[in-house]
Amino acid sequence: MSVHSEVLHALLKDPFIQKLIDAEPVFWANSGKKEGPLPRADEWATEIAEAEKRMQRFAPYIAEVFPETKGAKGIIESPLFEVQHMKGKLEAAYQQPFPGRWLLKCDHELPISGSIKARGGIYEVLKYAENLALQEGMLQETDDYRILQEERFTGFFSRYSIAVGSTGNLGLSIGIIGAALGFRVTVHMSADAKQWKKDLLRQKGVTVMEYETDYSEAVNEGRRQAEQDPFCYFIDDEHSRQLFLGYAVAASRLKTQLDCMNIKPSLETPLFVYLPCGVGGGPGGVAFGLKLLYGDDVHVFFAEPTHSPCMLLGLYSGLHEKISVQDIGLDNQTAADGLAVGRPSGFVGKLIEPLLSGCYTVEDNTLYTLLHMLAVSEDKYLEPSALAGMFGPVQLFSTEEGRRYAQKYKMEHAVHVVWGTGGSMVPKDEMAAYNRIGADLLKKRNEK
């Protein structure tokens, strides 16, 4: 799939695209955003509610198989944490005030697989397992799902396999839950994937296929192999409605947490949410769920590395999955391994095009610096890609286009939710190395 040469030639002359080519950090406000209710909102709301109910049915099973979820009775959820100290550090670093409250959605602390992918990835595997068991007549929705631990179920599921292409975190979530249920799982991993993620999957009995190419190639190869096996279910990060629904459930969970903090998004108290974006499924699902709940009172921005701005490029050009960052000469090489995606999901891009407020890009060095600052100020440890959201309010208030967007709203009482997408499963020595890089970069910056 490649862009027509004439279209690409015209695009390369665009001044904004030139900034992307030069790997400059940019802020882009989406001119295609529409006000008002979402199309087919009732249908989507029903599907998301059904996904939530399915998670509830599986909760007793999850609580028993994964003891770390027992306290939450098998519900896979993360805390919402105010980051006033981090906000203060950034105000000092950028020498300007950032109005409003800053909250960190701590998906890096999600149980089982330690990232936002625990939402969509685990959900799709659970749905597949439930469908198989229901069709076989082994299970009814009214059953206590703890019976899924029995050998008759794990033996039954072992006849089936699951495949997925991943830069790391999606593979972890699907591999861990799939193996626990008894499925044979194969994760097709791109060159960007961290070694510790591959090692952990192999420890769980998952087959890891490694590729020297990027994420899109790993997905394509996984899809191709799965098509040859009628007993293999391929979880397609680029096109999956079920992954999307699993992520969308996060919106109602966040609403419950905001309600507990007496935060009611409105014209007077607008909600700004910043989500790191790879292929688009995770942030797309969360964004869609939030827009269903809060409508025009929530403003969602996607964050991408300067070397991998695939969703921004797809949205800005209107070409979606028909264009890749490599088409404009970018290398898709970034320390933000979870975001190292060259081609966006067209399914997600087209769905979120009318509701997304915008996108921005962030340099690797900034991610490391933010990682260190957050560790020091709040004792929260995220992996580099998960810090992309933290740069959102900075870009909103520091760039001309960001300020132009913010001026339309009452920012004094705005609430900024930064989505921390992964980190708790990173080995201690790797996290310490990230922290050292960030500390060194910050020191050099302060010496200038």
From Swiss-Prot:
Its cofactor is pyridoxal 5'-phosphate. InterPro entries: D_Ser_am_lyase (IPR011780), Ser/Thr_Dehydratase (IPR050147), Ser/Thr_deHydtase_PyrdxlP-BS (IPR000634), TrpB-like_PALP (IPR001926), TrpB-like_PALP_sf (IPR036052). The keyword Cytoplasm does not apply. Keywords: Lyase, Pyridoxal phosphate. The keyword Lyase applies. GO terms for molecular function: D-serine ammonia-lyase activity; hydro-lyase activity; pyridoxal phosphate binding. One of its GO terms (biological process) is D-serine catabolic process. PROSITE patterns: DEHYDRATASE_SER_THR. The modification N6-(pyridoxal phosphate)lysine is found at K117. Its EC number is 4.3.1.18. It catalyses: D-serine = pyruvate + NH4(+). Belongs to the serine/threonine dehydratase family. DsdA subfamily. HAMAP family: D_Ser_dehydrat. This is Probable D-serine dehydratase. It comes from Bacillus subtilis (strain 168). The gene is dsdA.
